[in-house]
Amino acid sequence: MSVKPEHYDVIVKPIITEKATLVSDANAYVFEVAKDSSKPAIKQAVEALFNVKVKAVNTTITKGKTKRFRGRPGVRSDVKKAYVTLEAGNSIDVSTGL
């Protein structure tokens, strides 16, 4: 599959946290994705950008928290995360750039 410019708009960045590292043992990787992206679009983007076969895509939307900034309340943006499970034998090195 060839890489298209819109694939770079779907995947914002990889998420590297303790929880994301734990699920990577099960051949799953976590990415922050655009809010309007669908599961088929996420699957196509990951397969094209990283040259792997995707088994499943699960998504969650984390609501933004209310935080104080300079004494005034503000709201952080909502974040959509995609948990991408790969077929056996495939892997992604998220430490390297696209």
From Swiss-Prot:
Signal peptide: none annotated. Keywords: Ribonucleoprotein, Ribosomal protein, RNA-binding, rRNA-binding. SUPFAM superfamilies: Ribosomal proteins S24e, L23 and L15e (SSF54189). Coiled coil: none annotated. GO terms for cellular component: ribonucleoprotein complex; ribosome. One of its GO terms (molecular function) is rRNA binding. It holds the Pfam family Ribosomal_L23. The keyword rRNA-binding applies. Transmembrane segments: none annotated. It comes from the Bacteria. GO terms for biological process: translation. NCBIfam families: PRK05738.1-3, PRK05738.1-5, PRK05738.2-4. Belongs to the universal ribosomal protein uL23 family. PANTHER family: 60S RIBOSOMAL PROTEIN L23A. Part of the 50S ribosomal subunit. Contacts protein L29, and trigger factor when it is bound to the ribosome. One of the early assembly proteins it binds 23S rRNA. One of the proteins that surrounds the polypeptide exit tunnel on the outside of the ribosome. Forms the main docking site for trigger factor binding to the ribosome. This is Large ribosomal subunit protein uL23.
